[in-house]
Amino acid sequence: MSRGGSCPHLLWDVRKRSLGLEDPSRLRSRYLGRREFIQRLKLEATLNVHDGCVNTICWNDTGEYILSGSDDTKLVISNPYSRKVLTTIRSGHRANIFSAKFLPCTNDKQIVSCSGDGVIFYTNVEQDAETNRQCQFTCHYGTTYEIMTVPNDPYTFLSCGEDGTVRWFDTRIKTSCTKEDCKDDILINCRRAATSVAICPPIPYYLAVGCSDSSVRIYDRRMLGTRATGNYAGRGTTGMVARFIPSHLNNKSCRVTSLCYSEDGQEILVSYSSDYIYLFDPKDDTARELKTPSAEERREELRQPPVKRLRLRGDWSDTGPRARPESERERDGEQSPNVSLMQRMSDMLSRWFEEASEVAQSNRGRGRSRPRGGTSQSDISTLPTVPSSPDLEVSETAMEVDTPAEQFLQPSTSSTMSAQAHSTSSPTESPHSTPLLSSPDSEQRQSVEASGHHTHHQSDNNNEKLSPKPGTGEPVLSLHYSTEGTTTSTIKLNFTDERSSIASSSRGIGSHCKSEGQEESLVPQSSMQPPEGDSETKAPEESSEDVTKYQEGVSAENPVENHTNITQSDKFTAKPLDSNSGERNDLNLDSSCGVPEESASPEKAKEPETSDHTSTESATNENNTNPEPQFQTEATGPSAHEETSTRDSALQDTDDSDDDPVLIPGARYRAGPGDRRSAVARIQEFFRRRKERKEMEELDTLNIRRPLVKMVYKGHRNSRTMIKEANFWGANFVMSGSDCGHIFIWDRHTAEHLMLLEADNHVVNCLQPHPFDPILASSGIDYDIKIWSPLEESRIFNRKLADEVITRNELMLEETRNTITVPASFMLRMLASLNHIRADRLEGDRSEGSGQENENEDEE
């Protein structure tokens, strides 16, 4: 029977089932494949069971109950038919819950869940809360994005996270693990943030992993093992049977927000942040014959002029059914004073980046010819200045913001605390810090040339020597641009002592924050947090993405990744000097995210801040070329000797070492002296990147399938959150949430848009079809779960409205690719700095005028 059949035919199908003439499963596949069901969907019920954004929903095996997790850190089991809550569980999580699943064959009594702080909880509904709190796994270093259970296996589950690892846990072996730097359960080390996983339903030993380098990798789990089982391979290519990347994303780092196998396991659906949804056949291998872009072509594409916009954290005005593109708002005269202010600040930021970029390019040639360690005074004077005197320091990287997410900026291991320490862009910088999570947007990274970067570092050091150093510790504002977490790009404030800032910058040590900053969904709590809170470590997404740049083989470039598709062309620091207090307000915007370093305040705990909204802005598109880092020893005195000896000993290790480098936050090295800690972090990052680069080179020699895209689904907008799901519905339909607050449903075989449902006031993140019936559950930024059923009397699809929404989404998708989300405190500091600059200018004009008057009097 054709998919376009009518209801009378369906009634006959039901009659045949009652007579035993047809298999019930065939009937289900037939009615789920009918357009009349899809186009008659109507909101049946709303479950108000949470006090925060609902980031994960999951039906149980029988379709009777829904398990949900939220920013309120609670797990709730509810009955969607009676609208009642069965169980509310205080999970023990201290950050937004991103994924929660029932373990199969446990009668819905056992649950595994993960959150933005990387902690995984194993919960038994029948046990008390205190016992359940003991069953936690703190093995992941950064955000844990997803939990995946194995069909018909009640004992094991998998997880993936910002640290680039996929871990396999067996509850028969242990129900908790708080071991420091645990690597016992690592199944795969992707060297890049692993943001989504999926298991093939009919063949559960096939595992698909979505990474922040735009790739989807498929592994055969029979060829893999962990250290706990004694057969850990330690190579990211072991067991890999296929690797998929859309051709136009080959040289980019675009995060995968969702992976889903079809019921028959023949196709995989992949949703990319700040891009579209792709369908591919994992058994296909036709992409192998296509010519891959050369390194020069990749670099050329990275040289896009950065265009930056600013968005305040908690500003969801560009989401929801009533959101409009900027061009449409201007045409209708809807520009608000707030928008006007943000636009002026954005223009100023763009101007700074352009000036810094020009200076970086002019210095690039001189930097290559200048001998190591030689930086002339004239070079320092050529640094761009903001209206008055603030220096803008740029690590020659093109920063391209795709989808900004509010990500918490983490202090880089050493440069985090110093506005001058721009070493965060150094290629050998240490890993990332643990992320806090709420909702991040996709960001792209900066690509930095080693030579230019080196020159810039030297000018930074000279600048420090020339700058005044007060006798007492002065507060220095350090801003870090981070891309880890669930929202794209975020800027976080951190106050540090100027002495430590200078010391760290003089060492020339920096770390890439691989953490993708997280953005707080609706009610950002951290936007005005005290400075101490900002010093918390968060796992960055960027560092993992930076590593991917290595595969391009450009040894001279140092990539900086940003969750928001930001081609950050520079990491800049605006250091306006307050003439009255001598305080320097350092605005350190590091697109590669610094690894949190021990700051003057001892409060850098691993405990993450929880953001009000969990919708994570996809930290996706990153255009980076990761050059092989080259060590630069800029330290002096005993610390330099200690650092050098540590590095030399580490260099003796080979790539085949059992110590598999993982993306680790710099805070893990707090135990040792600052110099040694930073050196260890940098060395470990160096080996991690080198190992990833070698594995990428091996892919060309291995028999790994490379599928082509079978179908592309467009019209939705996926840029503000990192947890946006795409899913199959039956055998004939594909669906996805969107930043416009709608649910999109397409024909799986033709990509025709068939249905549009308004399902959230801001963003729809989660879509889970009922396992048997034509019922759909959805959730997003709103604090509820919505249940949809085919209750309309006639088809209600409005094609004209759908076309309007699609057109707006395309325009706004381009706009959000160039946007950075910043906290309100950043704007206040920026305005204060400009105020100081103006005051200094006026004071200078007055003194100059009085000086001329005195000269005239003397002449008379």
Swiss-Prot record:
Compartmental location: Nucleus
Keyword Hydrolase assigned: no
InterPro entries in alphabetical order: DCAF8, WD40/YVTN_repeat-like_dom_sf, WD40_repeat_dom_sf, WD40_rpt
Region annotation (Disordered) ranges: 288-340, 355-676
GO cellular component, one term: nucleus
Pathway: Protein modification; protein ubiquitination
UniProt organism field: Pongo abelii
Functional description taken from the UniProt entry: Ligand-dependent coactivator of nuclear receptors. Enhance transcriptional activity of the nuclear receptors NR3C1 and AR. May function as a substrate receptor for CUL4-DDB1 E3 ubiquitin-protein ligase complex.
Gene3D superfamilies assigned: YVTN repeat-like/Quinoprotein amine dehydrogenase
Keywords of the record: Nucleus, Phosphoprotein, Repeat, Ubl conjugation pathway, WD repeat
Residue stretches of biased makeup (Polar residues): 379-388, 409-421, 480-493, 561-571, 627-636
Biased composition (Low complexity): 422-441, 501-511, 616-626
WD repeats: 49-88, 92-133, 139-179, 189-229, 251-290, 718-756, 759-798
GO biological process entries: positive regulation of transcription by RNA polymerase II; protein ubiquitination
Subunit comment: Interacts with the nuclear receptors NR3C1 and AR in the presence of ligand. Interacts with DDB1, CUL4A and CUL4B.
IQ domain span: 676-705
Residues the record lists as Phosphoserine modifications: S336, S649, S657, S847, S850
Protein name, as recorded: DDB1- and CUL4-associated factor 6
Modification Phosphothreonine occurs at: T654
Basic and acidic residues biased stretches: 288-303, 312-334, 457-467, 535-549, 601-615
Lineage of source species: Eukaryota, Metazoa, Chordata, Craniata, Vertebrata
Recorded coiled-coil stretches: none
